[in-house]
């Protein structure tokens, strides 16, 4: 029984895999996937920041709603990260990488009302939803595009729920 090579080939940035997709398609998909991993990690942490620190009208409903959003966001980021590795890449998921590379605006830590948090969340959910929708058409790997489409559907729904609670 032979084992897979766990080294990069001399001519490639990728780890060896028997996946025969062409290298450029893999590299482009990995780059797009890592961008989403970074954004989704940031969005999951932002969601938890709001979840912990909000106060006011509709607290419990929004507090519990955000838990469900975060669970789905983490599931998507895990799917993206695993796809990166399937293609021979390295998933970039450390806090240091996220801090350095997130395109999201820093989340304010000095807000407390449910309404302030909903507005701040809507801005960031909207940014990620718009970015992933664009990424769907930019990747040549149909499996990656399908993953992005599934995440886009969830983000659009979450954004709708958030915006529906803004007074």
Swiss-Prot record:
EC number assigned by the record: 1.16.-.-
Q: Which PROSITE patterns match?
A: DPS_1
Reactions mediated catalytically: 2 Fe(2+) + H2O2 + 2 H(+) = 2 Fe(3+) + 2 H2O
User: What is one process in the GO biological process aspect for this record?
Assistant: chromosome condensation
Give the transmembrane ranges.
Answer: none
CDD domains in the cross-refs: DPS
Where is it found, in Gene Ontology cellular component terms? cytoplasm
The residues listed in the UniProt record as binding Fe cation, with positions renumbered to this chain, are: 51, 78, 82
Q: What does this protein do?
A: During stationary phase, binds the chromosome non-specifically, forming a highly ordered and stable dps-DNA co-crystal within which chromosomal DNA is condensed and protected from diverse damages. It protects DNA from oxidative damage by sequestering intracellular Fe(2+) ion and storing it in the form of Fe(3+) oxyhydroxide mineral, which can be released after reduction. One hydrogen peroxide oxidizes two Fe(2+) ions, which prevents hydroxyl radical production by the Fenton reaction.
- This protein is called DNA protection during starvation protein
Originating organism: Serratia proteamaculans (strain 568)
């Amino acid at each position: 029984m032979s084992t897979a090579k766990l080294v990069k080939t001399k001519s490639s940035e990728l780890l060896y895999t028997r996946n025969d997709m062409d290298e450029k398609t893999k590299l482009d998909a990995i780059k797009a996937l890592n961008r989403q991993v970074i954004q989704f990690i940031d969005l999951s942490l932002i969601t938890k920041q709001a979840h912990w620190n909000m106060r006011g009208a509709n607290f419990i409903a929004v507090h519990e709603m955000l838990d469900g959003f975060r669970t789905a966001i983490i599931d998507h980021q895990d799917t993206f990260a695993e796809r990166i590795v399937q293609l021979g890449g390295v998933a970039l998921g450390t806090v240091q990488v996220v801090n350095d590379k997130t395109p999201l605006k820093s989340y304010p830590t000095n807000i407390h009302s449910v309404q302030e948090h909903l507005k701040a969340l809507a801005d960031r959910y909207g940014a990620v939803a718009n970015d992933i929708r664009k990424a769907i058409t930019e990747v040549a790997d149909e499996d990656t595009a399908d993953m992005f489409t599934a995440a886009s559907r969830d983000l659009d729904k979450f954004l709708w729920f958030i915006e529906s609670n803004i007074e």
